[in-house]
A protein has these predicted regions:
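Catalytic-core environment of secreted peptidases
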Residues: 1-20, 26-35, 118-148, 156-158, ...
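Noncatalytic luminal/extracellular "stalk/propeptide" segments of secretory-pathway proteins
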Residues: 2-145
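Second-shell loop/turn segments in exported
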Residues: 8-21, 75, 86-90, 100-103, ...
């Protein structure tokens, strides 16, 4: 089975961007070339694409400093080309008590000190271990991996634990912008597109790494300072396309067993998030080599376009599928793939330099709505000798990423996913250096074997 180059042509595929739309076009061309029937389905998108961002601080002595910015906060808000300028107020943890304390400084008739301010707040990251995965696993392969995971750093900004600083609170107190200080090394903080699914908040925000944050606070220690924060963005109402591709099985549609939905998403920041598209194309190419008589089920490949945006900005796959019963009526189960072939990188829980760990990333093979599929997935993980893998339980009405949507519709679902520290990172070269091509191939072969076994299951599988 061949696998196309998992490259990052065109840069990050932010939702609705030219690079993203070009990627969807590429996938369509490949799938049509394999003989699949391909359809496109536009859905609404409140598009938000950052254009320019910068931070300049003028200290108490009147000296202007350009402060390096690690990243912008997606859909936080936007400024005009000149940005917004205001006094800098350091709120430390940024909790309600900090806001109240700052507001109290303006009591007695003085103007509220936060009105028109650029607030500075901490953006901590929970220091977790990979045992957060094994704690939710039916089984771990090999069993010795449980002990490894218990010692392995799993501090991940994409988990959103604790939640990102509250922009609405800052705005309600009169702030005009926010500067977040992340507890991450410069190399890891750079380009982190987080939180990746927040609603538009109307308050522009930028994020600094721990070193730039320390330098900023050193400037503030000299006395009152002012900041000019720039975050311009292209914000518009538009559409973006779901992509469906069908590979039919044998016999008339009414006589075939239910279809297998094979899904991923097309938007993402790098060659890992999302490389499910090339993997699904490899599966489509492989199964299209064989006559329809060898397939007892249709394969329906779905590429959703809106993983990296807020629920209110688009129509997510569960709602979209619910609105298309002509599609879901024929689907009996689902297989979802995301973030394959990933290598481990971390900064030792914030205590050291950002570097390769020498390990592969833990793999979650999550299963929902079917004991039959759980048994099948567990057996195939063993048979394929997939390592550092957990057979995961559903969690918080979800199935670890894109698999959540089929799961919420009650469809028996298997979802394969990893979650490296660089998952949401926009980086030079698209983080291709953190992708192991041989491992990517092994993961894709595992999916092909698993999909073949799912196709061979009798109709109306027990749940």
């Amino acid at each position: 089975m061949g696998l196309g180059r998992p490259d990052d042509r065109g840069g990050p595929r932010h939702t609705g961007s030219a690079a993203h739309r070009g990627h969807i076009d590429d996938l369509e061309r490949q799938l049509r070339g394999y003989g699949l029937t391909v359809t496109r389905h536009p859905t609404r998108l409140a598009q938000w694409l950052a254009q320019r961002w910068s931070l300049q601080v003028t200290d108490a002595g009147g000296t202007a400093w350009t402060v390096p910015v690690a990243s912008y906060r997606p859909r936080s808000g936007e400024t005009g080309p000149a940005g917004v300028t205001g006094p800098v107020v350091d709120l430390g943890p940024g909790d309600e008590a900090a806001y109240q304390a700052a507001a109290g400084a303006g009591a007695g008739g003085a103007a509220a000190p936060l009105t028109g301010a650029v607030v500075v707040v901490d953006a901590p990251i929970a220091r977790l271990h990979a045992s957060v995965l094994t704690d939710l696993a039916y089984a771990v392969h090999p069993p010795t991996a449980r002990a490894e995971f218990a010692q392995e750093d799993y501090s991940r900004v994409w988990l959103g634990v604790p939640p990102a600083p509250d922009l609405a609170t800052a705005r309600s107190h009169g702030a005009v912008a926010m500067i977040e200080i992340s507890d991450q090394s410069p190399a890891l903080a750079a380009g982190q597109y987080t939180p990746h699914q927040q609603e538009h908040a109307g308050l522009p925000a930028l994020r600094l790494d721990r070193e730039s944050g320390a330098r900023l606070r050193a400037l503030l220690a000299r006395g009152p300072a002012r900041a000019t924060l720039v975050l311009t963005a292209d914000r518009r109402e538009t559409t973006v396309d779901y992509l469906l591709a069908r590979l039919p099985g044998a016999g008339p549609p009414g006589a075939r067993a239910g279809a297998v939905l094979v899904a991923t998403h097309t938007d993402g920041q790098n060659a890992v998030e999302e490389n499910g598209g090339p993997a699904l194309c490899a599966l489509a190419e492989y199964f299209s080599r064989f006559p329809a008589s060898t397939r007892s089920r249709d394969l329906l490949f779905m590429f959703s376009p809106n993983h990296m945006t807020a629920d209110g900005a688009t129509v997510k796959p569960d709602a979209w599928l619910r609105a298309h019963p002509e599609i879901t009526a024929g689907v009996e189960m689902a297989l979802v793939a995301e973030h394959l072939g990933t290598l481990g990188w971390d900064d030792q829980g914030g205590t050291g330099p950002y570097r390769a760990t020498g390990r592969t990333e833990p793999v979650a093979v999550a299963v929902g709505n079917s004991d039959t599929l759980r048994t099948l997935a567990d057996d195939e993980v063993r048979t394929s000798r997939l390592t550092r893998a957990g057979i995961q339980k559903p969690f918080q009405n979800g199935l670890y990423g894109e698999g959540t949507f089929a799961y919420r519709l009650g469809i028996p679902t298997i979802a394969m996913i990893t979650g490296p520290a660089y998952l949401l990172q926009v980086a030079p070269g698209g983080n291709l250096d953190k992708l192991d091509r041989a491992l990517l191939h092994r993961h894709t072969v595992f999916l092909a074997r698993l999909l073949h076994r799912m196709m061979e299951l009798p109709g109306d599988i027990p749940r």
